[in-house]
């Protein structure tokens, strides 16, 4: 867990990120994210609330950490 990344995500997006925020942070197209969520292959857990799809900032941070570790290996 990177506290710097968590602090940055929380400051910029708040405690949860919508699909547009995820697209910006992960450098993915919104449609790709929606497709991966639909087929169950999106690497960050998401949930629906108030008609929108959300991801917790801690889960996004954990995914970014896994990516960083994979690049370092």
Could you describe each region identified by the protein language model?
Residues 1-2, 56:
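Non-membrane alpha-helical secondary structure
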Residues 25-54, 70:
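Major-groove DNA-recognition helix of helix-turn-helix-type DNA-binding domains
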Residues 2-35, 66:
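Polyanion-binding surface elements
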């Amino acid at each position: 867990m990177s506290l710097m990344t968590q602090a940055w995500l929380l400051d910029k997006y708040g405690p949860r990120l919508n699909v547009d925020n995820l697209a910006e942070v992960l450098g993915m197209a919104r449609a790709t994210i929606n497709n991966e969520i639909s087929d169950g292959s999106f690497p960050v857990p998401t949930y629906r609330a108030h008609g929108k799809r959300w991801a917790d900032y801690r889960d996004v941070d954990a995914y970014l950490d896994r990516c960083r570790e994979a690049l370092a290996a």
